């Protein structure tokens, strides 16, 4: 017997499985999350999923692989829901509010769920985020747009430690911030790969195509996130999210271009020390950390190999060619629902670009013009309807501005 009665079995830890619901299960983050859970069956149990329904075969295979009860599967598409019912001889949750309805059906007070991963795309994820926080389940948040749009509304709904970031940058910051107190932070540094158009001029960007924008140099992501990375709007959204999550003013959050995407974020403290989190570019590490927080999951992804010669390069972001980050700082400073305006305008402009009707630089031009037209929307929202109203106005203003360019 060892000291204090500890035997040779001291490394054994009896764990209760963490029960997880994944919203957006057929997307890039969702599918990787399911892979993490499949690789760690002793740690995680999948109890529910939601999806839009645009990939019915993938969705059906997930149901089979994890032996899910169809009553814990939510599908936005009525057509896919009917097909799924026929495949399994049961009834799934369906309709545009199905993700929220799933969340409300499996909260921890009902004894079914511990963690809900919100991997939905766009500000449509806000409703599910607020519903999750209401259940008191841990929220693993990959849907950055819901925090950007909801702002203080989301933060006020969250209990201490309830909201865990999944974005690689914010996961990295959360890890780095363990090295000191928030009042000891001098600045946060977000890293950006630079996207497929790093080094381009504004004139060169005029002719880029949606196919070119989809070719990210280091990350494999969904269509919208890949486009946002190309415009640097993704980095603007991450700046807003970091300011909200960690309580750091926007002017103390910097962005640097790091093409290798190995250093995911850094925190500089008041004594001059800079703490960085580095790992190969893979979302499985931040996903596994969010699902298991605060514990780490062994072998979540390959480790860096320092026996090989490696160069890590950093350079400043060209704000004149890529002004999205400057606009994001302005949105944080304006406050209220201005971050929601920023996001909504981008969502509308991105669709026009992807459909071949708007040039690439006009995406961020639309965001700037919409923010200018919506300066009065700087009051803090009282409820979800205030956010939705601001988004509706922003989307309308964005289309008014784009119409002048589309008619040229």
UniProtKB/Swiss-Prot annotation:
Pathway: Isoprenoid biosynthesis; isopentenyl diphosphate biosynthesis via DXP pathway; isopentenyl diphosphate from 1-deoxy-D-xylulose 5-phosphate: step 1/6. Mn(2+) binds at residues 167, 169, 238. 1-deoxy-D-xylulose 5-phosphate binds at residues 144, 168-169, 193, 216, 229, 234-235, 238. InterPro entries: DXP_reductoisomerase, DXP_reductoisomerase_C, DXP_reductoisomerase_N, DXPR_C, DXPR_C_sf, NAD(P)-bd_dom_sf. The keyword Nucleotide-binding does not apply. It catalyses: 2-C-methyl-D-erythritol 4-phosphate + NADP(+) = 1-deoxy-D-xylulose 5-phosphate + NADPH + H(+). NADPH binds at residues 26-29, 143, 145, 222. Its cofactor is Mg(2+); Mn(2+). Its EC number is 1.1.1.267. Gene3D superfamilies: 1.10.1740.10, NAD(P)-binding Rossmann-like Domain. Keywords: Isoprene biosynthesis, Manganese, Metal-binding, NADP, Oxidoreductase. It comes from the Bacteria. HAMAP family: DXP_reductoisom. NCBIfam families: Dxr. Catalyzes the NADPH-dependent rearrangement and reduction of 1-deoxy-D-xylulose-5-phosphate (DXP) to 2-C-methyl-D-erythritol 4-phosphate (MEP). Belongs to the DXR family. This is 1-deoxy-D-xylulose 5-phosphate reductoisomerase. It comes from Corynebacterium jeikeium (strain K411).
């Amino acid at each position: 017997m060892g000291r204090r009665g500890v035997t040779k079995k001291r490394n054994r830890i009896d764990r209760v499985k963490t029960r997880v619901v994944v919203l957006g299960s057929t997307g890039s983050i969702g599918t990787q999350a399911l892979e993490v859970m499949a690789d760690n069956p002793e740690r995680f149990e999948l109890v529910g999923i939601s999806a839009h329904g645009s990939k019915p075969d993938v969705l059906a295979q997930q149901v089979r692989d994890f032996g899910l009860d169809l009553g814990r599967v939510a599908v936005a598409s009525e057509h896919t829901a009917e097909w799924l019912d026929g495949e399994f001889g049961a009834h799934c949750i369906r309709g545009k509010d199905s993700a929220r309805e799933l969340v409300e059906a499996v909260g921890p007070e009902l004894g079914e769920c511990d963690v809900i991963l919100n991997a939905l795309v766009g500000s449509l994820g806000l409703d599910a985020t607020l519903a999750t926080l209401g259940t008191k389940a841990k929220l693993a948040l990959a849907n950055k747009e819901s925090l950007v749009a909801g702002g203080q509304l989301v933060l006020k709904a969250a209990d201490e430690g309830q909201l865990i970031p999944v974005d690689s940058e914010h996961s990295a910051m959360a890890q780095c911030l363990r090295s000191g107190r928030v009042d000891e932070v001098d600045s946060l540094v977000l890293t950006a790969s630079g996207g497929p158009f790093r080094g381009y001029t504004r004139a060169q960007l005029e002719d880029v195509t949606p196919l070119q924008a989809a070719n990210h140099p280091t990350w494999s992501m969904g269509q919208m996130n890949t486009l946002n990375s190309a415009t640097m709007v993704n980095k603007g959204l991450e700046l807003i999210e970091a300011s909200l999550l960690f309580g750091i003013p926007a002017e103390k959050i910097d962005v640097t271009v790091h093409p290798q995407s190995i250093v995911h974020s850094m925190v500089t403290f008041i004594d001059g020390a800079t703490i960085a989190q580095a790992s190969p570019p893979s979302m499985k590490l931040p996903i596994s950390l969010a699902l298991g927080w605060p514990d780490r999951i062994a072998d979540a992804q390959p480790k860096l190999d320092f026996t090989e010669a490696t160069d890590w390069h950093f350079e400043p972001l060209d704000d004149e060619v890529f002004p999205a980050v400057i606009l994001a700082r302005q949105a944080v400073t304006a406050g209220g629902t201005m971050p929601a305006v920023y996001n909504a305008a981008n969502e509308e402009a991105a669709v026009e670009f992807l459909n071949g009707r708007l040039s690439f630089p006009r995406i961020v031009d639309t965001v700037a013009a919409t923010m200018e037209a919506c300066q009065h929307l700087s009051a803090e929202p009282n409820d979800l309807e205030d956010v939705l109203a601001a988004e509706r106005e922003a989307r309308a203003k964005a289309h008014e501005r784009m119409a002048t360019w589309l008619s040229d």
